[in-house]
Amino acid sequence: MSKVLQCCQLSKSYIQGDIETKVLNDLELSVDKGELLAVVGSSGCGKSTFLHLAGALDSPSSGKVLINNIDIHQLSDKERAKFRNEHIGFIYQFHHLMMEFNAQENVAMPLMIRGEKPKDALLAAKEMLDQVGLSHRIDYRPSQLSGGERQRVAIARALVTKPSLVLADEPTGNLDSDTAEQIYQLIRSLNKTAQTSFVIVTHDLVLANRMDRQVKLVQGQLRPLSDNSEQALPPTSSITDPANNIKDNEPQANERHV
C-alpha cells in the first residue's frame, strides 16, 4: 500500500538562551493511504509540534517529512504553501472559520486561494457541504450555526481541495458526546469514500481506539498504544476552552473573529 506520510528521524529542538529543549527525538512514522491514525500523549509532550512539522507549518531541526514521497521541507516557502493547499487539510478543535463569510464562502476559500474561479469554487463548496449534511445552511454565517455545524463546515473546508492527508487537532474536543459521535461518523464516512488519510491528535482514548491504529507520543518518539484500558488523558491547557461541551443545538452568537 502506498505511503501518504513518512517521518524519518524527525527531531525538533527549541533554544531559549543557553537552554535547549528537545521536543521530538528521531521520531519515525509511516501512514498508509486511507489510514485513520490516532496520536495521543500527555500535555506538553510535543503533539502540536509534530502536527506543525507534518503539516509543513514549521521546519524540523533534523530529519525528513515526506508526503506522497515529496520531502516537504526541501521546498521553498512558496512551493510549500502551494503544496499544503493541494495535499493537506487541517481540522482544529476550534473551527477558525471567518465570521464575516457564510458557510459556502468559508469552504470555497482554499480553492479561491488556489486560483480557481469563484463560480467553480462555490459550486465545489456547495457539493462538499451537501456531503457533510449542511446543504440547508450554506448561506448561514458561523455565528448562526451550532458548534457541531461549525465543525462540519470546518471539515468540509479541509476536504474541499481533495487532500491526500488531513491533520486534525482535537476535532471533537469542544463538543458534547452526541455531536462528537456525529463528527466521528462523518470522518469515518469521508475517509471510506475518498480514501483520505487522517492523523488525529486526541486526548480521548475512546475516540482513539476507534481509529485504525493508535500511537502515543512519549519522550519525543511515537510508540504503539498497547493499553486500551487507559482513561482519557487530561486536556492540554493551551487548547482548553472554558465553554466546553457545546451542544449541537446551541448557536454561539458572540464569537470573536479569527
Curated annotation (Swiss-Prot):
For this protein, the Enzyme Commission number is 7.6.2.-
Decide whether keyword Translocase is in the record.
yes
Instruction: Give the span(s) annotated as Disordered.
Output: 222-258
Question: GO cellular component annotations, sorted alphabetically?
Answer: plasma membrane
Q: Where is the composition biased (Basic and acidic residues)?
A: 247-258
Q: Name one GO molecular function term.
A: transmembrane transporter activity
Q: Please report the record's description of how this protein sits within the membrane.
A: Peripheral membrane protein
Pfam families in UniProt: ABC_tran
| Annotated Polar residues bias | 226-243
User: Which residues belong to any copy of the ABC transporter domain?
Assistant: 5-244
Q: Which domain of life is it from?
A: Bacteria
Compartments where found: Cell inner membrane
Any single biological process term in GO: lipoprotein localization to outer membrane
Q: Which residues bind ATP?
A: G41, S42, S43, G44, C45, G46, K47, S48
Q: Give the record's keywords alphabetically.
A: ATP-binding, Cell inner membrane, Cell membrane, Membrane, Nucleotide-binding, Translocase, Transport
The record ties this protein, via PANTHER family, to: IMPORT ATP-BINDING PROTEIN, LIPOPROTEIN-RELEASING SYSTEM ATP-BINDING PROTEIN LOLD
Functionally, this protein is described as follows:
Part of the ABC transporter complex LolCDE involved in the translocation of mature outer membrane-directed lipoproteins, from the inner membrane to the periplasmic chaperone, LolA. Responsible for the formation of the LolA-lipoprotein complex in an ATP-dependent manner.
Q: How does it assemble?
A: The complex is composed of two ATP-binding proteins (LolD) and two transmembrane proteins (LolC and LolE).
What protein family does this chain belong to?
Belongs to the ABC transporter superfamily. Lipoprotein translocase (TC 3.A.1.125) family.
Q: Please give the name of this protein.
A: Lipoprotein-releasing system ATP-binding protein LolD
Gene name of the record: lolD
